[in-house]
């Protein structure tokens, strides 16, 4: 009884290491045995897939980083505007308070001619500042976003914006189509060589 040593190839083909390069086991196709011996890293189709994956990863990373930078920029602008609004409100309150006391608007010293103004200054100086409420925050976001979009479209014409957009989409489309066509070409080439063998 003779024991034969077989090894299983990555694609499931059984190969006998004692057989020569051109010899194959019964039931195996010569093309399958040859392909099983090839290194997977030498496959042009696989290399093209990895290059395409790397290209798409780079494009996605650039797009994601630009989106994150845009959001962070707007968030910083919103925070600055909210701080500016709070400072303005504090200045108004300080002005109202100084006018209230300069004009002697305390109820027991108030002059009847200044009754309306004193009431306005009293409301103004007792106003409570709510910094960073959801309403103020949403309003500041909308205002800042509108300003950024307006500034962007004032700097660029519609033609230049469309040109940039179409160029970016075109580069991505052409590159992915080229890699896909190259893989189809390689697969067709491999199937033709199998038919001729």
UniProtKB/Swiss-Prot annotation:
Alphabetized SMART domains for the sequence: Brr6_like_C_C (SM01042)
Record's bilayer topology term: Multi-pass membrane protein
Main location: nucleus
Function, in words: Required for mRNA nuclear export. Involved in the nuclear pore complex (NPC) distribution and nuclear envelope morphology.
GO cellular component: cell periphery; endoplasmic reticulum; nuclear envelope; nuclear membrane
Keywords: Membrane, mRNA transport, Nucleus, Transmembrane, Transmembrane helix, Transport
PANTHER family per UniProt: NUCLEUS EXPORT PROTEIN BRR6
Example GO molecular function: chromatin binding
Intracellular or extracellular location(s): Nucleus membrane
Complexes and interactors: Interacts with BRL1.
The family this protein is said to belong to: Belongs to the BRL1/BRR6 family.
Transmembrane segments annotated in the record for this chain: 54-74, 161-181
GO biological process, one term: lipid homeostasis
Annotated InterPro entries: Brl1/Brr6, Brl1/Brr6_dom
Protein name listed in UniProt: Nucleus export protein BRR6
Further remark: Present with 125 molecules/cell in log phase SD medium.
Pfam families given in the database record: Brr6_like_C_C
Gene: BRR6
